[in-house]
Amino acid sequence: MPFRRFRLALPAVLLAAAGTLTVVGAPAAQAAGESVNVWLTTTSDSGGRTVTRGLQQQTPVSFAATSPGAAQTINVNENTTYQQFEGGGASFTDTAAWLMNSSGALSASTRTSVMQKLFDPVNGIGLSFIRNPLGSSDLARNNYSFDDTCCDLNGFSINHDLADVLPLTKQAKALNPALKIMASPWSAPAWMKDNNSLNQGWLQSQYYGLYGEYFAKYIQAYQAQGVPIDYVSVQNEPTCCAGYPSMQWNTAGIQYFIKSALWPAFRNAGITTKTLVNDWNWDAYNTWAAPLLADTAIRNDPLFGGIAWHGYGGDVATQTTVHNQYPQVNAYMTEHSGGTWIGNQQTEDMNNLIDYTRNWDRSWVKWSLAVDQNHGPHNGGCDTCTGLITVHNGDGRSGQVDYTIEYYTMGHLTKFVRPGAYRIDSTANSAVKNVAWKNPDGSKALIAYNTTGSTQTVKVNWGGQSFTYSLPTKTSATFTWAGTPSGGGSGPGGKAITGLGGKCVDVAAASSANGTQVQLYTCNGSSAQSWTVGADGTIRALGKCLDVAAASSANGTKVQIYDCNGSAAQSWTANSDGTLRALGKCLDATGPSSADGTPLQIWDCTGGSNQKWTVQA
């Protein structure tokens, strides 16, 4: 069909009511007898560590118009959506990277196989989020920073990471291009601190500026190696702990450092890496994060990425409390280690996976990806932490790798839930805990765990159909099915808007939730790509308006859908050069890239092809 350039004058709501938002319209009819794939993991011991069945595919079952009754019922409703999934994984600590690479424990072929099993989405479990220490941590062979020489950054170098951490991170990114990479510091260089030690101590105020540049140099050095850093936190676990690399802060200091040192350094270097605050437990929120979220200069800055949580203390429901107060603040679970102190590791992991994501987390990240048979090497701190794999080094099984229960529990998420998926509604059930997701391609994944001591029959209802399954005790399950995505063709008066590579402007996962990312995606005629241009200057889909997040005109600000409110952030003007403009900036495909899932943002108008848009006549 012919296309024409269009002209419009278009405005964005800033904050929404908390809670669940429902996509308008009923789902399309589903295919009868939809096949459901089933994957199970079972342990046999009281500690939940002896894997007798690890992510084993079972005989598929099928949806039917009716199915037998069951003791437990789970209703899956893909028309109610929550947060977007960004990834799951662990950390390339110095310990993990050295064991897997230069320790000599693994042959090259074994290392290649291990990396594929960890990061390959098809031949492995598709880990999609890693959080690496920015310098030394407790799971390292020794203390180090990237510049150990006072009193400037002329000696800055990432040579330490070039040996093991960076090559493996680069390989992981090649195996899974959707991989998100986060960096967290345990300590500033010792010479910047009042005690001249990596362990504890305070950052001296005269070095705030240099420490901000230290972050920037790290990000630039990794970028130069082809490894972009998506997120940083200011400090891992503020004020914790003695005996290994760590650093003291107070909230006012962190607040000042972010606004006066870190972000100016990022802007001077042209860095768009997002900053996550807290990176600590739920019970630390009031002390470390609440004042930062209350600061609109931080919360509304394009360099702010959200809040990072650890799961070692407090109540996970704190995350929902915070979400309800700040619905536009993204939440990430960035560390919860496995360990020998945990009574049942499988139960712990499945509770974490389900509870964290039901409380708005966009990630689930364990601690060290690997440790050896002695839970090390370690640099003080945790000598009982476990990983997704155990690398035997120097013992009778040297060179062998054990895939722990944590590998399989993580795989129940990352192998089947792709970055860009949205959590969808499913019935909470204490006997069979569960969480459900809808992938960008419309497929579904229901993750469940039988918490009881006996087999449970479970009836799953979806789209007017159901299936019944007997789930054994001590068993994790992921059920997947293709499904027919909700919605249909373009609504009355709706038009497709196309951009770079002929891809369509698309609402991710067809979700009408406030804050849903707008992206490029292969044109498919769905309601998520059906846009109505209003005489009032708005562009609408799924009953919401195309919106610039927080009405910020900063380069890199997210473009989303939001309740229509008549503000300037939803007022778009189309120009004869093919650009769409709001707040003085152009609608822009990041990258520039035409890959499915490429997020849209606003940026200075450059005349580039990633800022040209057409609407179907």
Where are these regions (language model features)?
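Aromatic-rich beta-strand patches that line glycan-recognition/binding surfaces
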Residues: 516-522, 557-563, 598-604
